[in-house]
Amino acid sequence: MLQEIARDPVLSERLVLKGGTALNVFHLGLDRLSVDIDLNYIGALDRAVMETERPTVDAALNRLLTSQGYAVRRQPDEHAGGKWLSRYSSALGGNATLEIDVNYMARQPLFGAARMESRPLGEMRASDILVLDLHEIVAGKLVALVDRHAARDLFDARRILSIGGLDWSRIKAAVLAIGACGRRDWRTMSVDAIRGDPRELRQKLAICLPRDRFAGKGDVDAWIEETVALCRERFAFLFDLSANEREFLDGVLERGEINPDLLDVAPEIRARIGAMPMLAWKCQHVRKHRGLDT
């Protein structure tokens, strides 16, 4: 499906891959199976242009799914986008569901994107796929780690620790910007939010791993305990806010103001953070909620 998107004249330059599939299929060694497709629309930063293009993008994606034999069961109609649910015949028998999440609010890539070739899966390999920069993928994954407590996020977070050459100042700035957009107050977040559920791991993650990954009795509980401790130690700096970082969050969450110059990244990155539609929407919501627009 990713290959078909990359070949499509409408979608190839407008949709960029992010999330667990981008991380595992393009940057890691396929340590876990990740089949859902998370995409950002990046065709235009301007909202009016996006709204003009969206029907064409949605129609192209619908056409592509249908041509590949998928039966579209749900198409999102929210302003921000949402999940496409499509049924297909599984090679293991019966039907399965492919989820494609298209986000129309994350139109501003913070660190760019690049065409990449996937890791090989048997004799298959996707090529020329537009993938979000690894730093933004990692930042999004770490925000998800503390926000939704999914076993797959904990697994991915541990694997992220093995990736060399990352610029963690970039990642921290992106974590703060993305985290500020969420429903929770990022200023209250701490390492205590990093945790794992053995039952959820067995039910939802284990089936995406090699069969013998947690074969021994007590393996799951031991792995969670070790991984949570490791991630809390290594990611603690994300929650240790400087005065400027706290002021950035205060501006967004108290006054509905974006001041990216408070963040310790290059000027061009600050400009992109300042142009994030999701952050602008969050600030608009804060001002309305606090009666600051009157």
Task: Name every feature range the model reports, one short phrase each.
Residues 1-15, 25-37, 41-294:
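Structured mid-to-C-terminal alpha-helical surface segments
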Residues 20:
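Active-site glycine-centered loops adjacent to acidic/histidine catalytic or metal-binding residues
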